Amino acid sequence: PAAPEPQAVENSVKLADNATFGKILTDSNGATLYFFSRDTQDTSVCLGGCLDVWPIFYAEDLSLDAGLDEMDFATIDRTDGSKQTTYKGWPLYYYASDAVAGDTNGDAFNNVWYVAKPDYSLMYARAQLIGHDGKNYLEDYSEGEGLTSYITDDHGNTLYIFINDTKDMNSYTNPDFSNNSVWPIAEIDLASIPSILEVGDFGSIEVYGRTQITYKGWPLYYFGQDSSRGDNKGVSFPAAGVWPIANVNTTLAP
């Protein structure tokens, strides 16, 4: 008798073409995977009842479609004792209300859940602002406890604006970049962005031969003393509100 046809083994993480979002990450069955804006540290804060709606994705034996880099994936030990696969530091989840492969019903849910894509240039985080001074800050830079949404790079590193800058004008960086280690310019090529953000709000400027990304006319920077993913210490340095985060509420640069 003829030998049975070998079954094609599907990779544990696949790259799917989605009509709305372009390239997205799915599991081996084509179920869409998601990022959670609140997972700014190397852990998951989706616990308890949250997991009923957003079940975790974990691949014990990771196999990837072409175009995905194994170095971008890792496994975390969750506080509930289970394991979860991460991509560029973001834990991966399913959305329980996605019924069939290709569904993306969870995107922009409460403005904190986004379809996982390999080509995001930026991400949208939501976390407590904790300044360089160790104090908790709210979005208006008064002291207090509460979550603020803000733009990060694809790995979750916080981006800032400088209140002394004007539209498409970096007033901070020295021509020889001697102070660039304090507030490094964000040199990011814009590809895909989370659906809450508008492509038209982004641009770029030339800064002494290098290219800096802008948002609503504001040049974007990193803070050199943010040493870990999820840090947002720049909000209080040298004083609260001099280097704010950027989010959809940010006003246009003057």
Segments and roles (model prediction):
Residues 2-254:
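Compact beta-sheet-dominated domain cores in extracellular/mature segments
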